């Protein structure tokens, strides 16, 4: 195993923390801004136990937004509430690693965060829009429980190996990725199982570059 070449991040609850919504998520923030929180919350409770039905949940949740102004929602959810320490950590990592977002959240937010932080890519789920309003249509790119498949695809496309990758996440749907990469780090962990599954726990986001450096030093001398 050699030095790491890439660091991939979860979005919701990891890079951004939308307070007052379930899982600090972009989905919840958009629903709140659009005034459909109650209906969206009911859908979440209905579909959350059904792991194989995430695509149906995305479709149904997106339909709630049909006709709502994208700009009015954007005014309420932006600038994205980056977690404390994110900018400092990314500044230390940028230029040294391929940096990207792999999220089952919303691309509207993931793309904005990617641009603001100067990351290399973002992969998330799309809410379609026409004439400045959400159409109610969606494009599923990252299943809640399918992040590992997306990471494998990115690794192949970029000429990397899974051992080259550090992954940073906060919830149980991140565990399948944590189990296959070279280094996994939990931050803002929402479940004890996440801390149990990962290689390292970051007490603060700004600790992540140091944890990566320690890992690489250990690998170099192993």
Language-model-derived ranges and their functions:
Residues 1-49:
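Active-site neighborhood of HAD-like aspartate-dependent phosphohydrolases
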Residues 2, 83-222:
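C-terminal cap/substrate-recognition subdomain and adjoining C-terminal extension
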Residues 19-22, 65, 78, 143:
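Catalytic cores of large soluble enzymes that bind and process phosphate-bearing ligands
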Residues 21, 36, 67, 127-129:
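Short connector loops/turns at beta-strand edges and beta->alpha or beta->beta junctions
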Residues 53-87:
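Metal-dependent phosphoesterase signature
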